[in-house]
Protein backbone atom coordinates (compact mmCIF):
# COMPACT_ATOMS: atom_id res chain seq x y z
CA UNK A 1 0.00 0.00 0.00
CA UNK A 2 1.28 3.44 -0.81
CA UNK A 3 0.22 7.02 -1.11
CA UNK A 4 1.64 10.39 -1.94
CA UNK A 5 1.45 11.52 1.69
CA UNK A 6 3.45 8.48 2.73
CA UNK A 7 6.17 9.37 0.22
CA UNK A 8 6.19 12.85 1.73
CA UNK A 9 6.49 11.48 5.27
CA UNK A 10 9.40 9.32 4.12
CA UNK A 11 11.18 12.49 2.99
CA UNK A 12 10.64 13.94 6.46
CA UNK A 13 12.17 10.92 8.19
CA UNK A 14 15.22 10.96 5.94
CA UNK A 15 15.89 14.65 6.41
CA UNK A 16 15.05 14.52 10.10
CA UNK A 17 18.00 12.21 10.63
CA UNK A 18 20.49 14.62 9.09
CA UNK A 19 19.32 18.13 9.99
CA UNK A 20 19.48 20.11 13.21
CA UNK A 21 18.79 23.62 14.49
CA UNK A 22 17.30 26.02 11.95
CA UNK A 23 17.34 23.37 9.23
CA UNK A 24 14.54 21.58 11.07
CA UNK A 25 12.10 24.03 9.48
CA UNK A 26 13.26 22.77 6.08
CA UNK A 27 12.49 19.21 7.16
CA UNK A 28 9.01 20.33 8.20
CA UNK A 29 8.45 21.91 4.78
CA UNK A 30 9.47 18.64 3.12
CA UNK A 31 6.99 16.68 5.23
CA UNK A 32 4.19 19.17 4.60
CA UNK A 33 1.64 17.97 2.03
CA UNK A 34 1.21 20.60 -0.71
CA UNK A 35 -2.25 22.06 -1.16
CA UNK A 36 -4.38 20.93 -4.09
CA UNK A 37 -4.37 23.98 -6.42
CA UNK A 38 -7.45 22.80 -8.34
CA UNK A 39 -10.99 23.93 -7.51
CA UNK A 40 -14.36 22.70 -8.82
CA UNK A 41 -15.44 24.66 -11.87
CA UNK A 42 -16.54 24.39 -15.50
CA UNK A 43 -13.70 21.93 -16.17
CA UNK A 44 -15.13 19.47 -13.64
CA UNK A 45 -14.50 18.20 -10.12
CA UNK A 46 -10.88 17.61 -9.03
CA UNK A 47 -10.28 14.54 -6.88
CA UNK A 48 -6.60 15.38 -6.36
CA UNK A 49 -4.03 17.68 -8.02
CA UNK A 50 -3.82 15.42 -11.10
CA UNK A 51 -7.33 14.11 -11.78
CA UNK A 52 -10.44 16.07 -12.78
CA UNK A 53 -13.73 14.27 -13.46
CA UNK A 54 -16.27 15.79 -15.83
CA UNK A 55 -19.14 14.73 -18.07
CA UNK A 56 -16.77 14.06 -20.99
CA UNK A 57 -14.52 11.73 -19.03
CA UNK A 58 -11.28 12.38 -17.18
CA UNK A 59 -8.91 15.31 -17.48
CA UNK A 60 -5.37 14.53 -16.37
CA UNK A 61 -3.21 17.42 -15.21
CA UNK A 62 0.25 16.96 -16.72
CA UNK A 63 2.69 19.11 -14.71
CA UNK A 64 5.50 18.75 -17.27
CA UNK A 65 5.69 20.83 -20.44
CA UNK A 66 4.95 18.99 -23.66
CA UNK A 67 7.82 19.73 -26.05
CA UNK A 68 7.29 16.91 -28.52
CA UNK A 69 8.65 14.22 -26.19
CA UNK A 70 5.19 12.78 -25.48
CA UNK A 71 5.23 13.32 -21.72
CA UNK A 72 1.58 14.42 -21.58
CA UNK A 73 0.50 11.11 -23.11
CA UNK A 74 2.80 9.14 -20.80
CA UNK A 75 1.52 10.81 -17.63
CA UNK A 76 -2.08 10.40 -18.77
CA UNK A 77 -1.52 6.69 -19.40
CA UNK A 78 -0.14 6.27 -15.87
CA UNK A 79 -3.35 7.72 -14.44
CA UNK A 80 -5.67 5.91 -16.87
CA UNK A 81 -4.06 2.57 -16.06
CA UNK A 82 -5.23 2.79 -12.45
CA UNK A 83 -8.46 4.71 -13.01
CA UNK A 84 -10.06 2.24 -15.44
CA UNK A 85 -11.06 4.66 -18.18
CA UNK A 86 -11.04 4.08 -21.91
CA UNK A 87 -8.34 5.98 -23.77
CA UNK A 88 -10.87 8.05 -25.73
CA UNK A 89 -12.25 9.35 -22.41
CA UNK A 90 -8.91 10.91 -21.42
CA UNK A 91 -7.98 14.56 -21.91
CA UNK A 92 -4.84 16.38 -20.77
CA UNK A 93 -4.32 19.89 -19.41
CA UNK A 94 -1.05 21.52 -18.38
CA UNK A 95 -0.80 22.12 -14.64
CA UNK A 96 -0.89 25.63 -13.15
CA UNK A 97 2.09 26.93 -11.13
CA UNK A 98 1.84 25.13 -7.77
CA UNK A 99 4.05 23.33 -5.27
CA UNK A 100 2.03 20.15 -5.73
CA UNK A 101 3.64 19.77 -9.15
CA UNK A 102 7.28 19.87 -8.02
CA UNK A 103 9.56 17.64 -10.08
CA UNK A 104 11.22 15.17 -7.73
CA UNK A 105 12.77 13.37 -10.69
CA UNK A 106 14.86 16.37 -11.72
CA UNK A 107 17.40 15.82 -8.94
CA UNK A 108 17.71 12.15 -9.85
CA UNK A 109 18.06 12.94 -13.56
CA UNK A 110 20.78 15.50 -12.79
CA UNK A 111 22.99 12.72 -11.42
CA UNK A 112 23.67 11.60 -15.03
CA UNK A 113 23.33 7.97 -14.03
CA UNK A 114 21.35 5.42 -16.08
CA UNK A 115 17.67 5.26 -15.12
CA UNK A 116 17.96 1.61 -14.10
CA UNK A 117 20.51 2.59 -11.46
CA UNK A 118 18.33 5.43 -10.19
CA UNK A 119 15.33 3.08 -10.00
CA UNK A 120 17.31 0.58 -7.92
CA UNK A 121 18.25 3.11 -5.23
CA UNK A 122 16.63 2.77 -1.77
CA UNK A 123 13.46 4.82 -1.33
CA UNK A 124 15.21 6.88 1.33
CA UNK A 125 17.77 8.00 -1.25
CA UNK A 126 15.02 9.09 -3.66
CA UNK A 127 13.23 10.96 -0.89
CA UNK A 128 16.38 12.87 -0.03
CA UNK A 129 16.91 13.86 -3.66
CA UNK A 130 13.28 15.04 -3.87
CA UNK A 131 13.64 17.41 -0.92
CA UNK A 132 15.03 20.48 -2.67
CA UNK A 133 12.66 20.41 -5.68
CA UNK A 134 9.76 20.27 -3.26
CA UNK A 135 10.96 23.01 -0.92
CA UNK A 136 11.59 25.38 -3.82
CA UNK A 137 8.54 24.25 -5.86
CA UNK A 138 10.70 23.41 -8.87
CA UNK A 139 8.03 22.71 -11.47
CA UNK A 140 10.44 22.22 -14.33
CA UNK A 141 10.73 20.01 -17.39
CA UNK A 142 13.96 18.50 -18.67
CA UNK A 143 16.60 15.84 -18.26
CA UNK A 144 14.16 13.03 -19.10
CA UNK A 145 12.85 13.48 -15.56
CA UNK A 146 9.09 13.51 -16.22
CA UNK A 147 8.59 9.75 -16.03
CA UNK A 148 11.10 9.38 -13.19
CA UNK A 149 9.00 11.83 -11.21
CA UNK A 150 5.56 10.65 -12.27
CA UNK A 151 5.80 6.87 -12.59
CA UNK A 152 4.55 6.17 -9.08
CA UNK A 153 3.00 9.55 -8.32
CA UNK A 154 0.58 9.57 -11.29
CA UNK A 155 -0.47 5.96 -10.73
CA UNK A 156 -1.21 6.77 -7.10
CA UNK A 157 -3.32 9.70 -8.28
CA UNK A 158 -5.34 7.41 -10.55
CA UNK A 159 -5.68 4.69 -7.92
CA UNK A 160 -6.75 7.17 -5.24
CA UNK A 161 -9.40 8.63 -7.53
CA UNK A 162 -10.65 5.14 -8.41
CA UNK A 163 -11.07 4.12 -4.79
CA UNK A 164 -12.76 7.42 -3.92
CA UNK A 165 -15.30 6.87 -6.70
CA UNK A 166 -15.92 3.32 -5.50
CA UNK A 167 -16.42 4.61 -1.96
CA UNK A 168 -18.99 7.13 -3.21
CA UNK A 169 -20.88 4.43 -5.10
CA UNK A 170 -20.73 2.09 -2.10
CA UNK A 171 -22.23 4.80 0.10
CA UNK A 172 -25.13 5.26 -2.30
CA UNK A 173 -25.77 1.53 -2.59
CA UNK A 174 -25.16 0.73 1.06
CA UNK A 175 -22.59 -1.95 0.23
CA UNK A 176 -18.89 -2.63 0.77
CA UNK A 177 -16.72 -0.89 -1.82
CA UNK A 178 -14.66 -4.06 -2.21
CA UNK A 179 -17.62 -5.68 -3.93
CA UNK A 180 -17.68 -3.05 -6.68
CA UNK A 181 -15.56 -2.86 -9.80
CA UNK A 182 -14.58 -0.09 -12.19
CA UNK A 183 -14.56 -0.22 -15.96
CA UNK A 184 -14.86 2.24 -18.83
CA UNK A 185 -15.33 5.28 -16.61
CA UNK A 186 -18.03 3.65 -14.48
CA UNK A 187 -18.37 2.06 -11.05
CA UNK A 188 -20.29 -1.18 -11.50
CA UNK A 189 -22.34 -3.03 -8.91
CA UNK A 190 -26.05 -3.76 -8.49
CA UNK A 191 -26.38 -0.36 -10.13
CA UNK A 192 -23.82 1.41 -12.31
CA UNK A 193 -22.72 5.01 -11.96
CA UNK A 194 -20.59 7.11 -14.27
CA UNK A 195 -17.59 8.77 -12.70
CA UNK A 196 -19.20 12.16 -13.39
CA UNK A 197 -22.25 11.18 -11.31
CA UNK A 198 -20.04 10.34 -8.34
CA UNK A 199 -17.28 12.94 -8.61
CA UNK A 200 -18.66 15.58 -6.26
CA UNK A 201 -19.23 13.09 -3.47
CA UNK A 202 -15.98 11.23 -4.17
CA UNK A 203 -13.90 14.40 -3.74
CA UNK A 204 -14.37 14.09 0.02
CA UNK A 205 -13.63 10.36 0.14
CA UNK A 206 -10.11 10.05 -1.27
CA UNK A 207 -8.44 7.30 0.81
CA UNK A 208 -5.16 7.64 2.68
CA UNK A 209 -3.84 4.31 1.39
CA UNK A 210 -4.23 2.66 -2.02
CA UNK A 211 -2.75 -0.40 -3.67
CA UNK A 212 -1.28 -0.12 -7.15
CA UNK A 213 -2.18 -2.63 -9.84
CA UNK A 214 0.15 -5.49 -10.65
CA UNK A 215 2.01 -4.85 -13.94
CA UNK A 216 0.58 -8.08 -15.35
CA UNK A 217 -2.84 -6.38 -15.49
CA UNK A 218 -1.69 -3.25 -17.35
CA UNK A 219 -3.62 -2.33 -20.49
CA UNK A 220 -1.75 0.82 -21.52
CA UNK A 221 1.70 0.95 -19.96
CA UNK A 222 4.41 -0.73 -21.99
CA UNK A 223 2.31 -0.64 -25.15
CA UNK A 224 2.20 1.70 -28.14
CA UNK A 225 -0.44 4.35 -27.44
CA UNK A 226 -1.91 7.03 -29.72
CA UNK A 227 -0.62 10.40 -28.58
CA UNK A 228 -3.28 12.63 -27.07
CA UNK A 229 -1.85 15.73 -28.74
CA UNK A 230 -1.55 14.24 -32.22
CA UNK A 231 -4.84 15.50 -33.68
CA UNK A 232 -4.49 19.06 -32.39
CA UNK A 233 -0.92 19.37 -33.65
CA UNK A 234 -1.83 17.86 -37.01
CA UNK A 235 -4.76 20.23 -37.55
CA UNK A 236 -3.11 23.39 -36.23
CA UNK A 237 -5.57 23.74 -33.34
CA UNK A 238 -2.97 23.16 -30.60
CA UNK A 239 -2.23 26.30 -28.59
CA UNK A 240 1.22 27.36 -27.42
CA UNK A 241 2.69 30.23 -25.44
CA UNK A 242 3.19 32.20 -28.64
CA UNK A 243 -0.60 32.05 -29.20
CA UNK A 244 -1.22 34.18 -26.09
CA UNK A 245 -2.81 37.57 -26.75
CA UNK A 246 -3.39 40.25 -24.11
CA UNK A 247 -4.93 43.73 -24.52
CA UNK A 248 -2.34 46.15 -25.91
CA UNK A 249 0.23 43.39 -26.25
CA UNK A 250 3.35 44.09 -28.33
CA UNK A 251 5.66 41.68 -30.13
CA UNK A 252 9.40 41.89 -30.70
CA UNK A 253 11.89 40.23 -32.99
CA UNK A 254 15.61 40.34 -32.21
CA UNK A 255 18.43 40.31 -34.76
CA UNK A 256 22.02 39.67 -33.69
CA UNK A 257 25.37 39.40 -35.46
CA UNK A 258 25.42 36.18 -37.50
CA UNK A 259 29.06 35.81 -36.43
CA UNK A 260 28.91 34.58 -32.84
CA UNK A 261 30.37 37.17 -30.49
CA UNK A 262 30.62 39.83 -33.18
CA UNK A 263 29.59 43.41 -32.44
CA UNK A 264 27.45 45.91 -34.36
CA UNK A 265 29.08 48.99 -35.90
CA UNK A 266 25.79 50.69 -36.69
CA UNK A 267 22.32 50.33 -38.20
CA UNK A 268 19.69 52.19 -40.23
CA UNK A 269 16.09 51.57 -39.06
CA UNK A 270 14.38 53.62 -41.80
CA UNK A 271 13.16 50.72 -43.93
CA UNK A 272 11.89 48.82 -40.89
CA UNK A 273 9.83 51.77 -39.70
CA UNK A 274 7.97 51.73 -43.03
CA UNK A 275 6.70 48.17 -42.42
CA UNK A 276 3.01 48.27 -41.36
CA UNK A 277 2.70 47.45 -37.66
CA UNK A 278 6.29 48.29 -36.72
CA UNK A 279 6.41 50.84 -33.89
CA UNK A 280 10.02 51.00 -32.75
CA UNK A 281 13.55 49.78 -33.49
CA UNK A 282 15.69 49.44 -30.36
CA UNK A 283 19.50 49.52 -30.38
CA UNK A 284 20.74 46.68 -28.15
CA UNK A 285 24.40 47.56 -28.59
CA UNK A 286 25.33 44.28 -30.22
CA UNK A 287 22.08 43.88 -32.15
CA UNK A 288 18.60 45.32 -32.69
CA UNK A 289 15.05 44.56 -31.55
CA UNK A 290 11.97 45.53 -33.55
CA UNK A 291 8.75 46.12 -31.61
CA UNK A 292 5.47 45.73 -33.52
CA UNK A 293 1.77 45.09 -33.10
CA UNK A 294 2.04 41.50 -34.35
CA UNK A 295 4.65 38.78 -34.81
CA UNK A 296 4.78 38.94 -38.60
CA UNK A 297 5.42 42.69 -38.66
CA UNK A 298 8.16 42.32 -36.03
CA UNK A 299 9.92 39.63 -38.07
CA UNK A 300 9.61 41.55 -41.35
CA UNK A 301 10.80 44.73 -39.66
CA UNK A 302 13.88 43.04 -38.21
CA UNK A 303 14.83 41.74 -41.64
CA UNK A 304 14.38 45.21 -43.15
CA UNK A 305 16.87 46.94 -40.82
CA UNK A 306 20.18 47.72 -42.55
CA UNK A 307 22.95 46.62 -40.18
CA UNK A 308 26.72 47.06 -40.38
CA UNK A 309 28.05 44.01 -38.53
CA UNK A 310 31.57 43.89 -37.17
CA UNK A 311 33.76 40.86 -37.78
CA UNK A 312 34.11 38.21 -35.09
CA UNK A 313 37.41 37.45 -33.37
CA UNK A 314 37.67 33.96 -34.85
CA UNK A 315 38.24 32.59 -38.40
CA UNK A 316 35.37 32.96 -40.84
CA UNK A 317 35.31 29.40 -42.21
CA UNK A 318 35.99 25.80 -41.15
CA UNK A 319 39.26 25.52 -43.06
CA UNK A 320 40.71 28.53 -41.28
CA UNK A 321 39.49 27.21 -37.90
CA UNK A 322 41.19 23.87 -38.57
CA UNK A 323 44.42 25.65 -39.44
CA UNK A 324 44.39 27.52 -36.14
CA UNK A 325 43.85 24.28 -34.21
CA UNK A 326 46.65 22.49 -36.10
CA UNK A 327 49.03 25.37 -35.44
CA UNK A 328 48.42 25.01 -31.73
CA UNK A 329 50.03 21.57 -31.70
CA UNK A 330 53.80 21.21 -31.29
CA UNK A 331 56.12 18.37 -32.19
CA UNK A 332 57.63 18.24 -28.69
CA UNK A 333 55.84 16.86 -25.61
CA UNK A 334 54.75 19.78 -23.47
CA UNK A 335 52.84 18.05 -20.69
CA UNK A 336 53.48 15.33 -18.14
CA UNK A 337 50.90 13.35 -16.17
CA UNK A 338 53.28 11.46 -13.86
CA UNK A 339 57.01 11.22 -13.32
CA UNK A 340 57.66 8.67 -10.61
CA UNK A 341 58.66 5.03 -10.12
What is the predicted role of each segment?
Residues 1-341:
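Structural alpha/beta core scaffold segments of enzyme domains
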Amino acid sequence: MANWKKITRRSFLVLGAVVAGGAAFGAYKVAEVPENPLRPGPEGTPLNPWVIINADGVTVIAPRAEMGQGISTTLAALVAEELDVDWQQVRVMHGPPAQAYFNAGMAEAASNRPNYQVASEPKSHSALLAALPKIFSLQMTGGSSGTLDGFEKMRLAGAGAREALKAAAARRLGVDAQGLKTEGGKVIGAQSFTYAELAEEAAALVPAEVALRDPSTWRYLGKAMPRLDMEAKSTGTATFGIDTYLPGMKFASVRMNPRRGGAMKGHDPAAALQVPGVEQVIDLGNGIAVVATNTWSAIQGAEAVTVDWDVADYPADSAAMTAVIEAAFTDDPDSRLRDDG
